[in-house]
A protein has these predicted regions:
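Active-site glycine-centered loops adjacent to acidic/histidine catalytic or metal-binding residues
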Residues: 58, 119, 149
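Conserved G1/Walker A P-loop phosphate-binding module
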Residues: 1-75, 79-81
Length: 293
């Protein structure tokens, strides 16, 4: 008998959802940085064996939206509550159960198994962990609580064991050689955006969107032209940097990661353009592929 199911990962920003999904899939599907709101889209990672297919979904961190981009990000997270066969709610040892009460109420109403994963337990002690488990049990009494450390890979095998037990009997939903639902261009934009998140401070990384305008691939190499959109002329200057040095650093580091990702030589050209207030524009968000009501 073949098993297949959708395992959706939700939770607040910066609790380790993307790191966990990459571990579970065994491939680097989602970018993961130390900054909150790194993930903007719902991203599928597909794990295949002879008798099983697990379709994981990484989602943006749950937050109260301040502009339309964040509304779209919340839509991705809420949609993951609807179509899951198993729901992974990821928290950490700092977060309290009463955060985001509205979203937690929606989690309580799902009618599928919920695994509540307390991540980063390497940063706390046993006494505090026991107290936290009790608090989460009061918040989600039907959930199965598993303390983990994605960074140390502690108990991740236990999570996978429970997922395999919980997903239903079903034929596969995707081809057995398929790793994700996203095209190659998407991963180019994410890798470039990851470098921007790592190398720039404050609001700059959050005002950035990346679009691949050219992607030409042959047997040995890929030629890529990418545009980095910002909201202000001042942001454009910061991204480019003095004599273009900042942008060159981003492009160089992105190229290295892309070569590892695609296992081909990468020729990357980057440009910076201003798209004023794109994060608050329905039209621009739709053009950039975000989900709106």
């Amino acid at each position: 008998m073949h098993k297949a199911g959708f395992v959706n990962i939700v939770g607040n920003p910066n609790v380790g959802k993307s790191t966990l999904m990459n571990l579970l899939v065994g491939e680097r599907i989602s970018i993961a940085t130390f900054k909150a709101q790194t993930t903007r889209h719902r991203i599928m990672g597909i794990l295949n064996t002879d008798d099983m297919q697990i379709v994981f979904s990484d989602t943006p961190g749950v937050l109260k939206p301040n502009y339309k981009l964040q509304e779209s990000m919340l839509n991705f997270s809420e949609s993951a509550l609807v179509d899951a066969d198993v729901l992974l709610y990821v928290t950490d040892t700092i977060e309290k159960p009463d955060k985001n009460a509205d979203f937690m109420e929606k989690v309580r109403r799902v009618n599928v198994p919920v695994l509540l994963l307390i991540n980063k337990i390497d940063l706390t002690n046993q006494e505090e962990l026991v107290k936290l488990v009790e608090e989460w049990h009061e918040m989600l009494p039907e959930a199965e609580i598993i303390p983990i450390s994605a960074k140390a890979k502690f108990n991740v095998d236990m999570v996978m064991k429970r997922i395999k037990e919980l997903i239903p009997d079903s034929p596969p939903y995707f081809g057995k050689d398929q790793l994700t639902d996203k095209p190659a261009r998407f991963f180019v934009t994410e890798i470039i955006r990851e470098k921007i998140l790592l190398y720039y401070d404050k609001e700059i990384p959050y005002a950035v969107e990346v679009v691949v305008e050219q992607f030409k691939e042959d047997n040995k190499s890929i030629h890529i032209n990418a545009v980095i959109y910002v909201e202000r002329e001042s942001q454009k200057g910061i991204i480019i940097g003095h004599q273009g040095k900042a942008l060159k650093k981003v492009a160089t580091e992105a190229r290295k990661t892309l070569e590892h990702f695609f296992q081909k030589s990468i020729y990357l050209e980057t440009f910076v353009k201003v798209d004023k207030d794109w994060r608050s524009s329905d039209k621009e968000l739709k053009n950039f592929g975000y989900q709106l009501d």
